[in-house]
Amino acid sequence: MRYITVEDLSFYYDKEPVLEHINYCVDSGEFVTLTGENGAAKTTLIKASLGILQPRIGKVAISKTNTQGKKLRIAYLPQQIASFNAGFPSTVYEFVKSGRYPRKGWFRRLNAHDEEHIKASLDSVGMWEHRDKRLGSLSGGQKQRAVIARMFASDPDVFILDEPTTGMDAGSKNEFYELMHHSAHHHGKAVLMITHDPEEVKDYADRNIHLVRNQDSPWRCFNVHENGQEVGHA
């Protein structure tokens, strides 16, 4: 099922074109990476696709329902989330638990299934053993993993991730990529992830969308084949 469709999107800053004629899509059960050199407007494309920034022209269609006919839920993880207010008076467990309420309902009590899901979310990023620590005591990488665990606790249908493995070591990165691959292929999630290093994730992602440009022209979007060759518009 197609969750996100972007057609002929163009975005301008102060009348200067940044993105031009962008076309791409993301389906349920698919893990897609978005790459491009530094300054390639990857984050701008994500924000324009989500409506955080208003594209100048083009169409963005996001499905209203998931594969079960329920309201589609999207989790967006922006870049540098480790800089969030870690002075928030909460333990890691309480922080991750708060991510469950939008799915459950703010005024409904969590049951044993919810608690199991919270534990699994913490386990998935190696944070269960840190569950009783205060957010303010965490390292940058641990804060990143705590925010990711909270995102998992909300059980979204679509993951939009902007360089989510910042601050993680190589082993933790591979575990995260495997987790996202599993979420897509075994649970029908749609994953769109910005990464600066496509080589790290090539064994896990289904395809890569690459932003390129010629000289000073705006960035355009291309699919990248397994052999690294550009094969046309995404």
Curated annotation (Swiss-Prot):
SUPFAM superfamilies in the cross-refs = P-loop containing nucleoside triphosphate hydrolases (SSF52540)
Query: From the UniProt record, which GO molecular function terms apply?
Result: ATP binding; ATP hydrolysis activity; ATPase-coupled transmembrane transporter activity
Where on this chain does ATP bind? Answer: G36, E37, N38, G39, A40, A41, K42, T43
InterPro entries to which the protein is assigned, alphabetical: AAA+_ATPase, ABC_transporter-like_ATP-bd, ABC_transporter-like_CS, Metal_Ion_Import_ABC, P-loop_NTPase
Q: Which GO terms describe its cellular component?
A: ATP-binding cassette (ABC) transporter complex
Q: Which residues form the ABC transporter domain?
A: 4-234
Q: Which UniProt keywords apply?
A: ATP-binding, Competence, Ion transport, Nucleotide-binding, Transport, Zinc, Zinc transport
Keyword Hydrolase in record: no
Looking up SMART domains in the UniProt record yields: AAA
**Among its keywords, does the record have ATP-binding?**
yes
GO terms classed as biological process: establishment of competence for transformation; zinc ion transport
The record describes the protein's role as: Part of the ATP-driven transport system AdcABC for zinc. Required for transformability.
Q: To which protein family does this belong?
A: Belongs to the ABC transporter superfamily.
State what protein this is by name: Zinc transport system ATP-binding protein AdcC
Gene coding for it: adcC
